[in-house]
């Protein structure tokens, strides 16, 4: 299969189950909502060594938020609900409560699983906190130096999916990077997914385990490393490819990840110098979900 003259390999992305909480952060301005969201989703690229995977899902206009202010939806992902609750408390408590003019609302109010994060955060008020209603939602008002920090009582979570992905093969580092940026821009327009790596892009895609250093959980995916393509048996790097970037996508459900992969690939192949699109899979060792590239189209 080809799209815009670029080969789409007949392969699949292998993904795995993960627990996902969705949080809406609002602020007086879009800038401060984004600052708080960026801080709250830091050090969260991969569960290989981070305590969570997290990222900005989408921006929300004032007409879409409970308090009528600009907002940002973020997703925070861990393997277990217990760890997810800890991450929510720490990230909201340290990165959102501390940020100017912010408020926190439940991004999954209909989810069966609910964490009473707001109830726990209210204790920062040391007895001076109060209950209120915002657009029919129960919130706590915590007095702080600038005024009141408003947080909804609960934050919802569901069983989602992590590790949807595709690889972008370019004839140069800049062509591949430009295509990866275009892919991330397209994905950011959609609802239900995040791309948790820096700027949404993975420069150092890994394989599960190691050939030599068995103490590592993940190591360089040497079959996709252009600088050593002449040294690696069964390299996956074509002769005319000199850089590869991976886009990793987490999402609330399979449909959201498929839509994000499709949009990202369609954007990437419009960039001159892109030679091929592939995906990462590990023979079923990583997860139970398979997103076949050809079936996206």
Curated annotation (Swiss-Prot):
<keyword id="KW-0808">Transferase</keyword>
<dbReference type="GO" id="GO:0005737">
    <property type="term" value="C:cytoplasm"/>
</dbReference>
<protein>
    <recommendedName>
        <fullName>Formylmethanofuran--tetrahydromethanopterin formyltransferase</fullName>
        <ecNumber>2.3.1.101</ecNumber>
    </recommendedName>
</protein>
<keyword id="KW-0963">Cytoplasm</keyword>
<keyword id="KW-0484">Methanogenesis</keyword>
<dbReference type="GO" id="GO:0006730">
    <property type="term" value="P:one-carbon metabolic process"/>
</dbReference>
<dbReference type="InterPro" id="IPR022667">
    <property type="entry name" value="ForMFR_H4MPT_ForTrfase_N"/>
</dbReference>
<comment type="subunit">
    <text>Homotetramer.</text>
</comment>
<dbReference type="InterPro" id="IPR002770">
    <property type="entry name" value="ForMFR_H4MPT_ForTrfase_C"/>
</dbReference>
<comment type="similarity">
    <text>Belongs to the FTR family.</text>
</comment>
<keyword id="KW-0554">One-carbon metabolism</keyword>
<dbReference type="InterPro" id="IPR014053">
    <property type="entry name" value="ForMFR_H4MPT_ForTrfase"/>
</dbReference>
<dbReference type="GO" id="GO:0030270">
    <property type="term" value="F:formylmethanofuran-tetrahydromethanopterin N-formyltransferase activity"/>
</dbReference>
<keyword id="KW-0012">Acyltransferase</keyword>
<comment type="function">
    <text>Catalyzes the reversible transfer of a formyl group from formylmethanofuran (formyl-MFR) to tetrahydromethanopterin (H(4)MPT) to produce 5-formyl tetrahydromethanopterin (5-formyl-H(4)MPT) and methanofuran (MFR).</text>
</comment>
<dbReference type="GO" id="GO:0019386">
    <property type="term" value="P:methanogenesis, from carbon dioxide"/>
</dbReference>
<dbReference type="Pfam" id="PF02741">
    <property type="entry name" value="FTR_C"/>
</dbReference>
<comment type="pathway">
    <text>One-carbon metabolism; methanogenesis from CO(2); 5,10-methenyl-5,6,7,8-tetrahydromethanopterin from CO(2): step 2/3.</text>
</comment>
<dbReference type="Pfam" id="PF01913">
    <property type="entry name" value="FTR"/>
</dbReference>
<dbReference type="InterPro" id="IPR023447">
    <property type="entry name" value="ForMFR_H4MPT_ForTrfase_fd-like"/>
</dbReference>
């Amino acid at each position: 299969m080809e799209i815009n003259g670029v080969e789409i390999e007949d392969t699949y992305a292998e993904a795995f189950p993960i627990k996902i909480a969705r949080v809406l952060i609002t602020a007086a301005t879009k800038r401060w909502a984004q600052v708080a969201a960026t801080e709250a989703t830091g050090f969260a690229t991969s569960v290989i060594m981070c305590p969570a995977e997290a990222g900005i899902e989408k921006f929300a206009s004032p007409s879409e938020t409970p308090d009528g202010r600009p907002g940002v939806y973020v997703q925070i992902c861990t393997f277990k609900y217990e760890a997810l609750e800890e991450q929510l408390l720490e990230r909201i408590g340290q990165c959102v409560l501390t940020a100017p003019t912010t408020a926190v609302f439940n991004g999954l109010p209909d989810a069966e699983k609910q964490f009473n994060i707001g109830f726990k955060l209210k204790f920062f008020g040391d007895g001076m906190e109060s209950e209120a209603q915002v657009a029919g939602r129960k919130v706590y008002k915590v007095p702080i130096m600038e005024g009141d920090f408003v947080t909804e009582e609960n934050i919802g979570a569901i069983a989602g999916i992590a590790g949807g992905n595709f690889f972008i093969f370019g004839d140069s580092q800049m062509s591949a990077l430009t295509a990866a940026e275009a892919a991330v821009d397209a994905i950011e327009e959609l609802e239900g997914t995040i791309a948790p790596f820096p700027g949404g892009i993975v420069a150092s895609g890994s394989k599960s385990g190691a050939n030599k250093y068995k103490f590592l959980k993940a190591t360089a995916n040497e079959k996709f490393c252009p600088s050593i393509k002449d040294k690696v048996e069964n390299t996956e790097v074509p002769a005319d490819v000199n850089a590869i970037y991976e886009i990793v996508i987490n999402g609330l459900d399979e449909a959201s990840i498929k839509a994000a992969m499709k949009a990202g690939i369609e954007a990437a192949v419009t960039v001159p110098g892109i030679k091929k699109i592939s995906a990462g899979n590990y023979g079923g060792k990583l997860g139970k979900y398979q997103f076949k590239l050809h079936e996206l189209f």
